[in-house]
């Protein structure tokens, strides 16, 4: 059965300052249970895990989101937990994890992929946004201000999505990693990590479903191809 990636909003809309909720948590969790996202007004980094939405706020506090809470951007799916488990050893940093994941993508880099990599992490370095007020700035401007967090000897899961390069603009190409600890007290967008051993599950995704915002901000966006703000936010 072909798996589907559900995406709320377009990445270049987020770059253009469309930070209002494209979808509610309730709506997103009707069609997905695992993934990554960003809160309305950039008020936190979202990790979807096991059918719940966890937001790492600008101060680092992790909370369970309410069904009515808004999501400015998300990429999520119904994750197949029956996927084979693969052991990864000697993960020195995020770059080495990406190198270990490369063979799984190289077979068909034109598809989408999502992973869950769990275990005890020697270190995790994350960030979360500072929320914005209207009129919203461009993402490149908002990305100049964020908060970083460092955790050691923490157990949890990294959830990450891979989008192929040809969908750049609509999606953010390559890997995008979020972390959530098992006790749901630590999280955020991953800047770096290390671990002696992780247990990896990977899902290959062959269908893409895009939900565009029905907001005033989105209607006013001048969407076009161009340089991604990703370079400014260390993704």
Regions found by a protein language model. Give the residues of each.
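Hydrophobic, proline/glycine-rich low-complexity stretches
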Residues: 1-11
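A hydrophobic, small-residue-rich beta->alpha segment in the mid-to-C-terminal subdomain
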Residues: 181-224
């Amino acid at each position: 059965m072909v798996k589907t990636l559900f995406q709320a909003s377009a990445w270049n809309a987020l770059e253009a300052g469309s930070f209002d909720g494209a979808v509610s948590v309730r709506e997103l969790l009707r069609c997905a249970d695992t993934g990554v996202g960003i809160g309305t007004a950039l008020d936190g980094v979202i990790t979807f895990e096991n059918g719940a939405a966890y937001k790492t706020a600008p101060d680092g506090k992790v909370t369970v989101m309410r069904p009515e809470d808004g999501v400015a951007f998300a990429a999520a799916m119904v994750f197949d937990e029956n996927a084979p488990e693969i052991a990864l050893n000697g993960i020195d940093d995020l770059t080495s994890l990406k190198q270990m994941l490369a063979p799984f993508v190289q077979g068909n880099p034109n598809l989408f992929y999502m992973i869950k990599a769990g275990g005890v992490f020697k270190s995790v370095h994350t960030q979360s946004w500072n929320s914005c007020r209207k009129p919203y700035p461009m993402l490149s401007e908002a990305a100049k201000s964020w908060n970083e967090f460092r955790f050691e000897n923490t157990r949890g899961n990294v959830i990450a999505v891979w989008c192929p390069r040809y969908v750049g603009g609509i999606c953010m190409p390559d890997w995008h990693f979020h972390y959530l600890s098992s006790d749901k007290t630590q999280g955020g967008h991953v800047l770096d990590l290390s671990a002696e051993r992780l247990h990896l599950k990977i899902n290959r995704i062959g269908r893409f479903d895009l939900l565009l915002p029905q907001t005033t901000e989105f209607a006013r966006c001048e969407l076009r191809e161009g340089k991604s703000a990703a370079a400014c936010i260390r993704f």
